[in-house]
């Protein structure tokens, strides 16, 4: 059934987190980025339209500036992310070029998708880039985003951002790459008998209770934000796959119908 479901998928948003791009020692995982570029380029060659939502600016910045941990001051966090964003996009551009794929950068804040005029502008930008066969690479604009009681321009994390991008671009599928195999019925790091949920058809209280845990040293997203992203996909009749990003080539296996990760897809008439 999964292969049949994905045959009609045209537009795909792929989200990769910092933990999938940065090694445990803080160095950049060049091999994984190369594999990701290969997969996306292969999908483009097959007629798919792909948007990449990529975290990693902080991780790249920490590596470039030889910093062992994330600064505590907001201004310094923004500075590190600003440096890292340039380094990350430079590397993406170089590696994608090996596969004859052109990329672009779109940096967003929440204000952009809240106000109708700016939302229309960014939507048109996405459509123009896609029509030219370009892969938009999206990240939150950390250098200018603020999170204050009277005015917040932050999305919270890139899990949520990826679902918002999928919504405004009317993507058919969101593929979320993470450092976990999918959604389990309970925390697999604590319970040895935790079982992977292969298919989720609705976001219930039980599903929400399965989610937990904060982000890693480099990233901010946890399981709950991924569940919320799946709910957002459901709201516009989209679907989502949460899978381990250890080998980005697994994306191709999933789209061929192999059961990996957790597939979030509501049951429709004719599916039962």
From Swiss-Prot:
Keywords from the named record: Amino-acid biosynthesis, ATP-binding, Cytoplasm, Kinase, Nucleotide-binding, Proline biosynthesis, Transferase
Enzyme Commission designation: 2.7.2.11
Catalytic activity line of the entry: L-glutamate + ATP = L-glutamyl 5-phosphate + ADP
SUPFAM superfamilies registered for this protein in UniProt: Carbamate kinase-like
Binding site for ATP: 15, 178-179, 220-226
GO BP: L-proline biosynthetic process
Annotated GO CC locations: cytosol
Binding site for substrate: 55, 142, 158
CDD domains named in the record: AAK_G5K_ProB
One Pfam family in the UniProt entry: AA_kinase
Pathway listed: Amino-acid biosynthesis; L-proline biosynthesis; L-glutamate 5-semialdehyde from L-glutamate: step 1/2
GO molecular function, one term: glutamate 5-kinase activity
Subcellular compartments: Cytoplasm
UniProt function note: Catalyzes the transfer of a phosphate group to glutamate to form L-glutamate 5-phosphate.
Recorded family membership: Belongs to the glutamate 5-kinase family.
PANTHER family per UniProt: GLUTAMATE 5-KINASE, ISOPENTENYL PHOSPHATE KINASE
Protein name: Glutamate 5-kinase
């Amino acid at each position: 059934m999964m292969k049949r479901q994905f045959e009609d998928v045209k537009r795909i948003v792929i989200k990769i987190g910092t933990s999938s791009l940065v090694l445990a020692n803080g160095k950049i995982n060049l091999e994984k980025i190369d594999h990701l570029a290969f997969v996306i380029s292969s999908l483009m060659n097959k007629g798919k339209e792909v948007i990449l939502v990529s975290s990693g600016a902080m991780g790249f910045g920490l590596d470039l500036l030889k910093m062992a941990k994330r600064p505590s001051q907001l201004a310094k966090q923004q500075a590190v992310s600003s440096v890292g964003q340039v380094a990350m996009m430079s590397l993406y551009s170089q590696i994608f070029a090996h596969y004859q794929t052109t990329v672009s950068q779109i940096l967003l804040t929440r204000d952009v998708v809240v106000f109708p005029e700016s939302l229309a502008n960014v939507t048109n930008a996405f459509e123009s880039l896609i029509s030219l066969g370009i892969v938009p690479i999206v990240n939150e604009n950390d250098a200018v985003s603020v999170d204050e009681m009277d005015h917040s321009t932050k999305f919270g994390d890139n899990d949520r951002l990826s679902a918002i991008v999928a919504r405004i671009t009317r993507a058919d599928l969101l593929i979320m790459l993470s450092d976990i195999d999918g959604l389990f019925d309970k925390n697999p790091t604590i319970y040895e008998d935790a079982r992977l949920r292969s298919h989720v058809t609705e976001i219930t209280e039980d599903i929400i209770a399965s989610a937990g845990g904060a982000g890693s040293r480099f990233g901010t997203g946890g399981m709950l934000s991924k569940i919320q992203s799946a709910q957002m996909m459901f709201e516009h009749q989209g679907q989502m796959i949460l899978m381990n990003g250890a080998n980005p080539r697994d994306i191709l296996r999933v789209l061929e119908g192999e059961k990996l990760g957790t597939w979030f897809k509501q049951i429709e008439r004719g599916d039962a």
